[in-house]
């Protein structure tokens, strides 16, 4: 007769096994169970019963579980804590990328507040600055461009609103900011057109004509470029010189 299974004592799982179990639950989509399993690793670490590597791995995986559940605030907290403690960890670049994406995936439509877009931009900049050799750096650069595009679009949207509300000076301030800070974005043609209209409104015809000429020449392939040319011709000032 063999030993009574109920009396058998198995050794406790190793730190690596505990983390692997949480990782497996995460991979199968059982995020709540993964968080529960991995949280035990963190607790054991606080009790001095778990190595720091296991703690770091569990910390990231908990953040990843929250990320996949779109629980952005909790994911951000985990990722920020990881980066603050382990900025040179072998997966620190991935954690930084996930942190940036936690903001990026929350970006609002153009007409709404773009604070989250700015935060995403800041975190992607940190990614490419601190981890330039990362496999995620290329996508980080692409996301930087998209964030800048969205912020520039919002500035133009606000400028257009100010102009339609009879506040050309506020509109000018926004439009000139776009030309200065976001010169490589796709909103430049629209910005030039609107700034020309602001100048016409304020009686600065020569400045308006110069902007429309630039628009019709440099961006003739765009709809705004074609509209700029039409506006220039209809103004009767096409031959005006400054």
Which stretches of residues belong to each language-model region?
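Acidic, polar-rich low-complexity tracts and alpha-helical solenoid repeat scaffolds
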Residues: 1-242
């Amino acid at each position: 007769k063999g030993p009574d299974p109920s009396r058998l004592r198995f050794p406790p799982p190793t730190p690596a096994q505990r983390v692997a179990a949480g990782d497996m639950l995460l991979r199968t989509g059982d995020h709540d169970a993964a968080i529960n399993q991995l949280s035990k690793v963190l607790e054991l670490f606080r009790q001095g019963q778990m190595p720091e590597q296991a703690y770091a791995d569990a910390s990231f995986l908990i953040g990843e579980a929250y990320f996949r559940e779109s629980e952005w605030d909790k994911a951000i907290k985990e990722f920020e804590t990881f980066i603050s403690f382990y900025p040179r960890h072998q997966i620190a670049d991935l954690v930084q990328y996930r942190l940036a994406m936690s903001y990026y995936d929350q970006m609002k439509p153009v007409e709404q507040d773009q604070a989250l877009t700015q935060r995403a931009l800041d975190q992607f900049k940190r990614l490419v600055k601190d981890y330039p050799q990362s496999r995620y750096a290329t996508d980080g650069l692409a996301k930087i461009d998209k964030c800048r595009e969205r912020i520039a679009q919002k500035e133009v949207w606000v400028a257009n609103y100010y102009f339609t509300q009879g506040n050309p000076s506020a509109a000018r301030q926004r439009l000139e900011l776009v030309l200065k800070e976001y010169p490589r974005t796709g909103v430049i043609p629209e910005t030039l057109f609107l700034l020309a209209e602001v100048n016409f409104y304020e009686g600065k015809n020569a400045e308006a004509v110069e902007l429309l000429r630039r628009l019709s020449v440099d961006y003739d392939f765009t709809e705004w470029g074609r509209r700029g040319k039409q506006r220039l011709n209809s103004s009767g000032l096409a031959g005006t010189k400054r």
